[in-house]
Structure formats: C-alpha cells, structure tokens
Amino acid sequence: SKRRTAQMQAITATIQKEQNQVIRHADAPTLLVNGIAGSGKTSVLMQRIAYLFYQQRESLDPSEVFLITPNPVFERYIEGVLPDLGERNPECLTWDEFLRGLMPPERSGGQAPASLDAFERIDEACATFSFDQHDFKEIHCNGERLVTVGQILQVAAKFRNIPAGPHLVTLMREELLRRLDSRLKQLAASDKVLDEISMLTLDQQVELFRETFDPHDESQVREVAQQYVDLRFADARRAVENDDWLRIDRIGMRLLGVENLVPVEWLYLKMALTGLGNADAKYVMIDEVQDYTVAQLAVLARYFKRAHFLLLGDQNQAIAPGTATFDQVRALFREVRGPLEECRLMTSYRSTPEITQLFASLLDDDERLSISSIQRADTAPEIIACASEQDYDRELRRVLAQAVGDDGLTAVVVPQKHQAKLLRKKLGDAAPALIDAAATLPASGVVLVPLKLAKGLEFDHVIVPDASERAFPDDPLSRRRLYTTVSRATRGITLLAQGEITPLLAARA
C-alpha cells in the first residue's frame, strides 16, 4: 500500500540519517556509538573505516588503523567486506592476540580483573622509583651469556641521576645495545666462531645466509663472521630492544606489595616504565566496547597513545559481570583523550516489531520509547509458564519438535554452558546439537547455544528453555542477559518456564 511504502521510506531515511551520523562524523578524539541490538553497528563500523580510508586516501595506511574485537571470527568476516568496499584491511586483533604480541608467553594468558586504583598506584610509584639489582635479569642466547646483571647495574649507575621511567629506560636500552654490539664483534673475531663457520655445510650456509660463500681475504671472512653472529644472536638483540632485561613481575610486586601481577597490571607497568606503546596508530576501533573492563580500556588508551578512538557497543548487552559501564567508558576517555562525542542508533532492522518491543520492554522508559523496527509485523512472542514439571517437559519437547520442521535456523539459547549440558542430558536423543566457538552454524535446523556464543549472532527463531526467575532474577545483569537473548531472534521467539515466568517479563506473561 501507499501508506506502507511511505512509512518504509520514512524509516529508511531515519536509519540512513542515524548511520550516516556515525559513518561521516567529523574526526574526534573519541566517538562513542551506543546502538541497540540489530541497529547495524557492524555495518556502520565497516563503512566508517572505509570512509576514513577514502577521506584520507593519500595519507592513511591500513597499518595505522586497528580494530579490536572480542570475536576472532570477525577477522575472517572483514577480510571479505572491506575489499568489497574498495579498501584494504586494517589490523584486526582480539584482546588475547593484543596481549600475546606484547607479553612473554607465560604471562599473557588469563582474564584476572584489575582496577584503575592499581594503575594509579603504579603511576605514583614510578614517579619516585629507583631500580635495584634484583630488578634486572641476564640475556642469554644459544648458550652464550651476552648481557649480565653486572653490566646492567653499571649502565644504571651511569644514569643514576635520571628518575625511573621511559627516558631512563631508553638511555639504558641504547647503552645496552652498544655493549651488545661490542660483545658480538668480539664473538665474530673469536676462533670458536670462525671454526663454526668453516664447518658449515653448503645447505647450512644457504639456510643461514640464503646463499653460499667462499671468502677470499680476511675482510670477507670478518664480514661473514659478523653476519653469522648477528643472525645467530638476533633474539638477544630483540630481547634488549623489548626491555626483557627488566624483571617486570618483580618490580610490580615491590611497587604494589602483591605476590603476583595480573596480565593487565604487568602490561600497564611495562608501559609506565618503558614507554611501550604504538605512536603510529591513527585510529583504533573497539567493537563491543561493553565487553571490556575499565582496566582493559585504560591499557588500550595508553598503548595507542596518539590514536583517535571509535567505541561501538550496546550498554544493554553487557552480559559479563565486572565490565565497564558506559558512564565509566565516558569518564575514562574524557580523562585521557579530552572531549568525547556520542551517537545513538535506535532503529532495529534485524527483529520484527513484536520481538523488538519485547526486548525494548526490558529497558528504561526513555530508551524504550525511542526504539523502533523496520521489519514487517510477524507472530507475537510465545510465553509459556507451566504449572508442573510434567507440563513443562511436554511443552519443551513440543516446541523443539515444531522448530525442527520450521524454515530457517532456530537457536535454543541458555545463559551458561553448564546449563546447555544439563538440558542435553534432560532431553536425551531429542537434544539439539551443542554449538561451540569453532563450529560453523547450519543454514537451518535447531542448535543449542550458550549466550556468550549467541551474542553477536542472529537466528530466525529463538527458544529460551528456562525463562523463570531462577534463570533470570530481577537484577540488572539478568535483565541485560535476557535483553541480549531475546534480541538474537529475527522472526519468532518462544520463552518457557516451569512455574512463574521471570518478573522481568511478568507483565507480558
């Protein structure tokens, strides 16, 4: 009908206006995008990156743009999207990949929380800190001790009038590299190294030097020997350049009075002491910003010291305890980056109006009244409260059997992985396949998915097998988990409970 067409045109114009507000936003130190479920945040992110590349096509290199995402699958996804938009890919990292690139393998694992208080104590302590002999460690490589603690202490004494911090560590690093070069020259002139070179087979020569050699005079012999030791002890040079001669753990324990540093504390301390960071990055995009802790965001803000930040997320999809609230995100980036600008995306093009209305009912009045959907009306959400366990079991099996015959893909979404295992045990042969992080979703059928994996995905239908108060009590975290669960559905949703439905939805039951 003409009226429907006019409505669609008006809604489409609203979406374009909302999204263009982000895509074409003037450059800002920090741009925070708070978008409801299904509002096209991923699309906006891709188009924003493409827009920046186009705007700065003469000066912006993909290596200067970083995308931090909690989802490792996202990297594969953007490999196809940005080239289609005519652009090369930015650097794409998960938090774990970011840590692994900067920390020793034995230190980079784990998600132990840290507070900004610890960072403030590190900053305060570094202002008056002095190294002692226990803060240093030797550099060994291929059986050779190349930098000793005694040498590091000599270098520290040379610069004793300079306070601890990036300037001092830079001076010490440069002096240690000079001493390492001197040590490698001595090794290159040693009989031991000359004997090792003379014993190399042709295959070993090619493996090391990518060519064979046959030196004819002493200068050529010295040149080959220097190349040999430089290659053989390249890891030692990297260790000095990376400040691996500092015992960050030991320094941190002394500064903070703790027995062990969590990974983000370790990394923050190394940044504070050495100036570790990326000064070349121009833009950093953090997707699903509500999934990060304040400490993680503080580390990213300090590491990418000169970059402008685009922060995308949905404050109502913070489904893990301890992550940053949007108020905390605003406060942090205003403190470290200055003015912060914000855009809202309030129109859903993923879910039907009925589903959109259901997850919007979980929000505050102001937010709920601003949300709309562009999809056609479809079936109303089905909310089933069963009086007995027998009734519940029968209804659950009926709903699952019906879903098997439906078109599209149905997800049975549970809050935690252990609940998925309990449900599979209860249903036996009728249980859907449990999806894990490595699995590829089928195009149709029924799958069982923990909420953590379902987040960021969409399904034609969603079944919530336990929407009781036990699973979703009336508290802010459960409210966000239910909002996230419901908003995975595009066309239909069924919620079941043995006993009363969660009070979060009681008015709709």
Regions found by a protein language model. Give the residues of each.
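Alpha-helical nucleic-acid-binding subdomain
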Residues: 53-285, 291-299, 307, 316, ...
